[in-house]
């Protein structure tokens, strides 16, 4: 599990909450006090919850699950995109499109259109069109890529969502809750931690704090992937063990072992299209 110390959190400003007049009383257990009308978050409470959240992310990745990184506010976009790409997970950094989860079937159609336009631009199709048609198709591609480019390889609903600001991403969280998708999120002093499954009490605005969260989440995912069992190796060991029990001392043919593909995780049921 990625180790983030309390000192690192202090240096990143994780302990600075919002103004006291905007606080949510349900965050009281995680607030140390106030300084200059700003709530101070108790990092002694944050650290264990942070570790629990990272362990959960790691367990998802170890089972070859998918974690959707979500951060559409300006201070989170760059870090979320960079770290999601580093751990090869889907992400969204522009405006959340209503129905991205609950109407996933329609979203996949839009993604298919994006891939179609990308292919047309590289296979010579655009060269056969007149200039104004090409400009129109490129604008369409750019618009689709801005909103869906980060999830174009996400072929099924995610197994979990990692969120930076639950107020900014409230629609996404409602959709995830409706579908039973676990939400791991940074929760500042002005929100209700009960809205998510794994709450991390902390500043959700400071760029350094957001970088710390995103980097740790990506590290947790990479650690989980590294710990995932290699199905080919497991099968070879099982084959050899069975052969040993029969007293024949046979070994699994290397070719068969390497050709054995990992079982894909069961696809989450698609929600019916919204009316």
Curated annotation (Swiss-Prot):
InterPro entries: Ribosomal_uS2, Ribosomal_uS2_bac/mit/plastid, Ribosomal_uS2_CS, Ribosomal_uS2_flav_dom_sf. Keywords: Ribonucleoprotein, Ribosomal protein. SUPFAM superfamilies: Ribosomal protein S2. Residues 264-275 have a biased composition (Low complexity). One of its GO terms (molecular function) is structural constituent of ribosome. One of its GO terms (biological process) is translation. Residues 226-275 are annotated as: Disordered. PROSITE patterns: RIBOSOMAL_S2_1, RIBOSOMAL_S2_2. One of its GO terms (cellular component) is cytosolic small ribosomal subunit. Pfam families: Ribosomal_S2 (PF00318). It comes from the Bacteria. PANTHER family: 30S RIBOSOMAL PROTEIN S2 PROKARYOTIC AND ORGANELLAR (PTHR12534), SMALL RIBOSOMAL SUBUNIT PROTEIN US2M (PTHR12534:SF0). Belongs to the universal ribosomal protein uS2 family. This is Small ribosomal subunit protein uS2.
């Amino acid at each position: 599990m990625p180790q983030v110390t309390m000192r690192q959190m202090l240096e990143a400003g994780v302990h600075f909450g919002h103004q006291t007049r905007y606080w949510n009383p349900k965050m009281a257990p995680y607030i140390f006090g106030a300084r200059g009308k700003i709530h101070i978050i108790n990092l002694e409470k944050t650290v264990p919850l942070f570790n629990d959240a990272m362990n959960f992310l790691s367990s998802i990745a170890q089972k070859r699950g998918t974690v959707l990184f979500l951060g559409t506010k300006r201070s989170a976009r760059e870090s979320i995109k960079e770290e999601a790409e580093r751990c090869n997970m889907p992400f969204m950094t522009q405006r959340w499109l209503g129905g991205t989860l609950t109407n996933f079937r329609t979203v996949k159609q839009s993604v298919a259109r994006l891939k179609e336009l990308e292919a047309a631009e590289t296979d010579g199709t655009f060269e056969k069109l007149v200039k104004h048609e090409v400009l129109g198709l490129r604008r369409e591609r750019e618009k689709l890529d801005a909103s869906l480019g980060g999830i174009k390889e996400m072929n099924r609903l995610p197994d979990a969502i990692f969120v930076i600001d639950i107020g900014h991403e409230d629609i996404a969280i409602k959709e995830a809750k409706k579908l039973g998708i676990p939400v791991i999120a940074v929760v500042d002093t002005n929100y209700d931690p009960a809205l998510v499954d794994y709450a991390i009490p902390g500043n959700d605005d400071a760029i350094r704090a957001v970088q710390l969260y995103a980097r740790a989440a990506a590290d947790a995912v990479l650690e989980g992937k590294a710990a995932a069992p290699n199905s080919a190796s497991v099968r070879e060991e099982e084959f050899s063990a069975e052969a040993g029990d029969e007293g024949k001392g046979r070994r699994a043919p290397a070719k068969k072992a390497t050709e054995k593909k990992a079982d894909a995780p069961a696809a989450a049921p698609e929600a019916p299209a919204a009316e």
